[in-house]
Amino acid sequence: MRTSATNPLRSLNFQRLCWANLLFWTFAFGLIPYLYLHFGGDFLITTGCILAFTVGLIVPGPFNAYIVERFSRKAVFLWSSILQGVCALALLEANLPLIYIYVLSVCFGVFFEFAQNALNNTIVNDLLLSSSRTLGDSLLSWFGRFGLPIGWLCVLYLPQLLGQPALTDALLFIPLCLSIFLVFCTKIPLKAPVKVQLISCDRFWRSCGWPLFLMCLVAAGIEGMLLALVLQTPISATVNNILFIGAGLLAAFFVRKTVFIEADDRAEMFVGLLLYLAALLLLAQPLSSIHNAAYALFGAGCGLTASRLLMYFLKLSGHCQRGTSQNTFMLGWRIGFAIGWSVVVFCYDGLSVSTLYYAGAGVVVGLLCVYLVLVHPWFNKHKDRDFRFKEV
């Protein structure tokens, strides 16, 4: 068996990056319920912040490659993380005009994009051998996904568990501070500077992957819709639902490494979307006793679907296009999440919750058909024929 000396995935530096990514996304996801509570349960303002944050992710994209080539990648992550923390602190200031809240949310998104681009698309690939990067990227993304349930629990559950509601602020910002510390302690190899244009699509947008991008939009839209509905339930119910979503994610992580290791490419996506569908149909029923299982199924479906879509993007990559593919996937998922979340704002008063779930189920059925009939054949035609590295 290879040791950490020959297998970078076992190295302390890579493990630090995985935990740093978990904590980084824990902070970002935890900010959603925190802002919802901070604004007195005003769902409209919270949605505006999410949309402004998403705009902030897009704005700096054309400068991504220039920033990480012109400056130290570690410094880009550290300073961007610090500045997004400053933006978050400013957001929590009482009595800010609404326009300032949205401007700060855009700034938060800008610094978040710079930080995640440095960490997920650049630093991790600098640490790994070419034969280890696909598995490394997959593991890093899984750690980031677990930030969703952990972030929400840090804000909604831990303060009540500890009997100290005043600790909510600290429990929100501690993950970000720990993430900064872990990356600061990571030894990152020096890389010769490469001359790049100030504005480019490198590490920002992979146009040839637009069918996969559209699939990300729809799949993440369902996730955003469901989580928006979850957040509007009483805190105790929200905590319970997030626990089961997290359990489903965890189950999907282990199932993927066993059941799908030698399976057909379509199997993981097919099962993930079927779990999506089953969860939405169960949630549309009035029997609350089956809802816990539905949320667990949804978490598992979300994990499997996102994992396979990322793998498709990586397999689509040509030479030196890995970071661009990763960022395109991230943008698709975050934009789709914001769209799905916003749908609830505009439809929640006019439609029943069960109607939204049935509509979501119909969208999933359509997505599954499009995937099997159009997207998967398209992918087989356009994927990188030289891709030969392990997935799990």
Name these PLM-found stretches.
Residues 106-142:
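Cytoplasmic helix-loop-helix junction between adjacent transmembrane helices
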Residues 165-185, 355-377:
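Symmetry-related core transmembrane helices of the 12-TM Major Facilitator Superfamily/SLC fold
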Residues 57-61, 239-265, 272:
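Transmembrane alpha-helices of Major Facilitator/SLC transporters
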Residues 114-128, 303-318:
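Intracellular juxtamembrane helix-capping segments at the cytosolic ends
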Residues 312, 316-353:
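A late C-terminal transmembrane helix in Major Facilitator Superfamily
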Residues 132-156, 330-342:
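Glycine-rich segments within core transmembrane alpha-helices of 12-TM secondary carriers
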Residues 265-309:
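C-terminal transmembrane helical hairpin of 12-TM major facilitator-type secondary transporters
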Residues 2-54, 211-240:
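Helix-loop boundary and gating motifs at the non-cytosolic
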